[in-house]
């Protein structure tokens, strides 16, 4: 089942780009492009598999030609980990006790 959370996607818009650090108002949730994360022909991955990326980095990730497939995967994974850290550090995500 695919997880959806609009509040999470909106919160990511407040983060800096986790690839280049820019805070230019274009940052949004870039979903994983990997099948293992639920990506399908007409399906986005779950909302918990996102990375905060600016328009430029998101475009390069999805349609760019500057990086190899492996480099794109590594870029997204690093940005995803940084995004999860940012979400916890900024108390967007917290643990229930």
Where are the language model's segments positioned?
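Short, intrinsically disordered, charge-biased short linear motifs at domain edges
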Residues: 1-10, 38-45
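Short cysteine-rich loop/turn motifs with clustered Cys
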Residues: 3-30
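Cys/His-coordinated zinc-binding microdomains
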Residues: 21, 55-58
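Short recognition patches in nucleic-acid-associated and regulatory proteins
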Residues: 25-41
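Active-site cofactor/substrate anionic-group-binding motifs, chiefly glycine-
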Residues: 51
């Amino acid at each position: 089942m695919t997880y959806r959370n609009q509040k999470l996607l909106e919160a990511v818009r407040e983060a800096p780009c986790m690839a280049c650090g820019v805070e230019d108002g274009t940052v949004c949730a870039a979903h994983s492009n990997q099948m293992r994360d639920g990506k399908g022909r007409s399906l986005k991955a779950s909302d918990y598999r996102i990375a905060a990326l600016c328009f430029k980095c998101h475009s390069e990730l999805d349609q760019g030609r500057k990086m190899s497939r492996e480099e794109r995967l590594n870029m997204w994974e690093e940005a995803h980990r940084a995004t999860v850290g940012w979400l916890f550090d900024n108390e967007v995500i917290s643990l229930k006790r």
